[in-house]
Amino acid sequence: SSSLEGSNVGLGISFYLNEKNHFVVSNVYVNSTADKKGLKPNDEIVSLDDLECSKNDSDTIIKYIKAHEGKSVKIKYLREGKEYTTNLIPGVFDTTVICNIYDGYGEIILSSFSENSGKDFSKAMTRLQESGIKKLVLDLRNNGGGYLNAALEISSSLIPEKSVVFKEQDKSGKFTKQMTKDEFNQVKMDKIVVLQNENTASASEVLIGALKDNLGKKVTTVGTTSYGKGTEQVTVPFSDGTSFKYTVAQWYTPNGTSINKKGFKPDIEVELPEAKTTSYYKFNKKDVIKKDSVDTNAKPLQIYLMYLGYSVDRTDSYFSNTSSEGLANFQQENGLDATGDCNKKHGIYWLKKYY
């Protein structure tokens, strides 16, 4: 399926709108055209060819990029106030691996296990190695799994060669050891911190088990107990669009532990605040959340405001006068029109402040 493949068409970035209506890069996907050209988080995209970002909404920009798949697009962007120009060719990219390098450690965010995740992860690890990084934060939160083969490939970049990644038991009771892949080389880390939550499942848990059993105290898990999916399924599609899924095996960690219906308990338990697990509905152009009104986005808006420390007296779908004052204070402090109302532009910009 497309979700397992993890593919999309574009430049290979995710972005948000800032107060100047520039498209600010929030993430760059490994091995995408943007990644190959050196775009970085916080770069502000000013224009694409003759299309000025400040005069167009995100839907128009996205449509323009997709319409130019395989064609060169001139990108003008700002980095730390200095203007740069480069040519990018929109194309298919994998959306599962993001790599960031910070002072003293690297971060890899793995959103799922797709067909291409293994090679993209390997490239990210090589990048960390070339930068002299010896500590890794591996973010598996909300990663529900995917291809087990990708879990084998990714494990091969982290644990010694010829190691057991997991054991599977078929319905006859026969056990088979699944080993690391020879074509992927281990990049040794002194410390790996794995972030997990209740939505970390399946192939993600295979990876956690492989790391814990093979690397021992070098690995620390942080978050909440993982989902606990210790079985393997096969999906059979039918011509009418429906499909049939059935279980073919159960998997165990290298040391023989089953986490099915139990999950992995973290070494350090950390509960996320409500704001970190609250999503919002898409803002349309004309949507405005005004004080003393009811709106589906008023709930997440007030939850985010409260998380950021602004005055809020409720967290339901009613946007109160007090919450509007809190939003106005936020807007004033961030160079926005202090209206106390939330529209698409102000909403997206300030939501990025939270995320």
Identify the meaning behind each predicted range.
Residues 94, 145-195, 199, 231-235:
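Gly/Ser/Thr-rich loop/hinge elements
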Residues 332-355:
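Extracellular LysM carbohydrate-binding repeats and other cell-envelope/extracellular binding modules
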Residues 12, 29, 37, 49-133, ...:
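C-terminal, low-ordered peptide segments at domain boundaries
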Residues 2-3, 20, 38-61, 224-225, ...:
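Short glycine/proline-centered loop/turn elements that form peptide/ligand docking sites
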Residues 30-44, 96-97, 318-319:
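PDZ/PDZ-like domain micro-motif
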Residues 269-318:
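Acidic, Ser/Thr/Pro/Gly-enriched interdomain connector segments
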Residues 34-56, 136-139, 214, 222, ...:
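Conserved PDZ fold ligand-binding element
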Residues 1-27, 87, 281-290, 294-301:
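PDZ/PDZ-like peptide-tail recognition elements
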